[in-house]
Amino acid sequence: RLHNGIGKYVRIDGDNYVEVSQSLRQLISRLRLYNDDLENRIAIPELALASLDNEFDDAFASSNGDLLAIRDRITKSQIAEFVIPSTLNGELKNYQIDGYKWMMRTLSWSGGVCLADDMGLGKTIQTIAVMLQKRDDGPILVVAPTSVVLNWQSELVRFAPSLNTKILNQCAHKTKMIDEISFGDVLVASYGMMLTQIANLEKKEWGIIVLDEAHAIKNYNTKAFK
């Protein structure tokens, strides 16, 4: 009922009313911004939890364990120091360092990231820095338009020679390559190749999946999106 209206008094049944405190009304107003239009309840996406500040600590304290765990990861990520990997063969500009730290911070609490800098500002090297830092999380999959697959290979060789880069499009034994890929490996594939090998790719537990020109999957009716 609070979902539908948050006046000072809310009728719970018949002639019985309960007074809603100002702090609770403020909380509900904030939460309704993230509402998924579910009947009689408010849904909060994980990514929205980062914007709920300390004034709502009491609400988190009485919530379920999953919500508390997510909030704890977010809190820790805000104070964590994310250093540039020493294995990165290149120098990041200040704004690229900010982008790298933002990606690491968001990934540390299981959020996904969308890096939308203008062309030429170094999205690739920022992403490669993240790959180097997260290499111990598992093999890495990069999906890109066919026209830039080889560019990814050259950039990885240039900036991250310690990573083992493999091009799925060039391999004659694709199933074997996917099966054998492991920690420290980066598999680069075109969107078309991803679709033909999706059954094999889905079997693998990837540490990171990078989608270059991710607008390629914006249409939810396409096979690439699914």
Give short role names for the model-derived ranges.
Residues 60-226:
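ASCE P-loop NTPase motor core, strongest for the SF2 helicase catalytic module
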Residues 1-73:
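Charged, low-complexity intrinsically disordered regions
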